Amino acid sequence: MNIIDELEWRGAIYQQTDEEGLRKWVDEKQISLYCGIDPSGDSMHIGHLIPFMILRRFQNAGHRPIILVGGATGTIGDPSGKKEERKLQSMEQISKNVESLRVQLGKIFDFEGDSAASMVNNYDWTKDVSILDFLRDYGKEFNVNTMLSKDIVASRLEVGISFTEFAYQILQAMDFNHLYEFNDCRLQIGGSDQWGNITAGLDLIRKKQGENAKAFGLTIPLLTKADGTKFGKSEGGAIWLNPEKTTPYEFYQFWINTDDRDVVKYLKYFTFLTEAEIDELAKQVETEPHLRAAQKTLAAEMTKFVHSEEALEQALKISKALFSGDVKALTADEIEQGFKDVPTFVAEDSEANLVDWLVTLGIEPSKRQAREDVGNGAIYINGERQQDLEKIMDASDRIENKFTIVRRGKKKYFLVSYK
């Protein structure tokens, strides 16, 4: 299947320039193509991942991806999709963010072989451009009326836009032109809000490289959820690729909780499963939705891709332990992942009567309630029911001498650490 046909089947094309020309190029040649991200934060979230998944699909089809981290454009801020001016970050923070993104993006692509990926930073070719060079060599090529008509600018005219953000599309166009000239880059990929920036780059390439210059643009549809909420968010906020911000277990759980109405679409967007494999999972969604086979496959594929096989195994282990209640099998690291969002308490490093211990920590509101819950078998320590009112909590009740997991009833968990 032609890569363009595959992207259309996956529902991953929103707009493209010269569809016939691009099809011919990718059929007949190995092309270089790029997608960029600005270092506005120290981690990508799963929404950022979408265009880079397309870039990876091109690599799998034998083409050469260029990953651009915007050390220069990140100092300005892309106005696309923003209702107000971005707050400028320090150069020091931007440099730190660049390095963090390099690490994350480095896990997604193959940097060896005939279709080896490369990673670039637009600061390298922008830092020495003087203001006079910028105005003479590039500003002269842009018509203000055309710039004002771009959606990214037009949507901000009423509330106002600074010259800094107004000029962003020129900088991004400079990137495409530079990569065309020095890396033979023929295609830019971006989200649906990047159409104006991409076409600005194509215009600049034609003016700088000649009318016969062959370059293309392709944008991806905005991914929406069936319930109308924003994709990539959970109750706890954005789903990050950085495991310190979103643990692999939380990452896995996000995908496992995908709505039946969305899961086939996500399988097409985010996994490298074949059409036949996805069709089979789609049938199971229709006939055996309670098995959640599609969600389990999606969660497994994404956790492996973004994190690792080991991280997936850990997420599965945590899920199984929480479902069965056998939490003693978990390591301290797995406990921190699986119980990140439960109420947490810090206990004294000393022995104490179970009833007193529960009340002192605040897990139980009173001794009367604590005695009642213990006596009724509603209290579990590390997965084991405790009904002994005289039980003494000591070091043997700690997992790896760090944590005690308390469960009240069927689902209410508490995590206790020690001073």
Curated annotation (Swiss-Prot):
A motif ('KMSKS' region) lies at residues 230-234. Catalyzes the attachment of tyrosine to tRNA(Tyr) in a two-step reaction: tyrosine is first activated by ATP to form Tyr-AMP and then transferred to the acceptor end of tRNA(Tyr). HAMAP family: Tyr_tRNA_synth_type1. ATP binds at residue 233. One of its GO terms (molecular function) is tyrosine-tRNA ligase activity. Keywords: Aminoacyl-tRNA synthetase, ATP-binding, Cytoplasm, Ligase, Nucleotide-binding, Protein biosynthesis, RNA-binding. Homodimer. The gene is tyrS. Residues 352-418 form the S4 RNA-binding domain. It comes from Listeria monocytogenes serotype 4a (strain HCC23). This is Tyrosine--tRNA ligase. It is found in: Cytoplasm. A motif ('HIGH' region) lies at residues 39-48. GO terms for cellular component: cytosol. CDD domains: S4, TyrRS_core.
